[in-house]
Amino acid sequence: MAKYTLVVKIGGGLLREGGLAALRAACDEVAALPGRVVVVPGGGPFADAVRAVDGLPNPVAHRLALAAMDQFGAVLAHVAPELELVGAV
């Protein structure tokens, strides 16, 4: 068992700027890291859609932003099927 856990965020800007190939490359780099690694997905284009809706109350926007992270996590799991998609660690 690893002595530590490394937490890495892969943000949605990577998808916007480099597409799926950039996400795959980032996942490859993360997979090469030593020890236990947890990837936290950003919201990506899904969070952008939440931001585009003007006037949402903060609690609603927050809930939607968390859902956006789940959706982007599903994209990461598609791009790198060797990653295990989990809801909690």
Q: What do these predicted regions represent?
A:
Residues 1-38:
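N-terminal glycine-/serine-/threonine-rich phosphate-binding loop
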Residues 14-16, 44-48:
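Short, active-site-adjacent cap segments at secondary-structure transitions
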Residues 51-89:
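Ligand-binding beta-strand-loop-alpha-helix segment within the catalytic cores
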Residues 25-29, 49, 75:
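Residue-level detector of alpha-helical secondary structure
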Residues 8, 38-42, 82-89:
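General beta-strand structural signal in soluble alpha/beta enzymes
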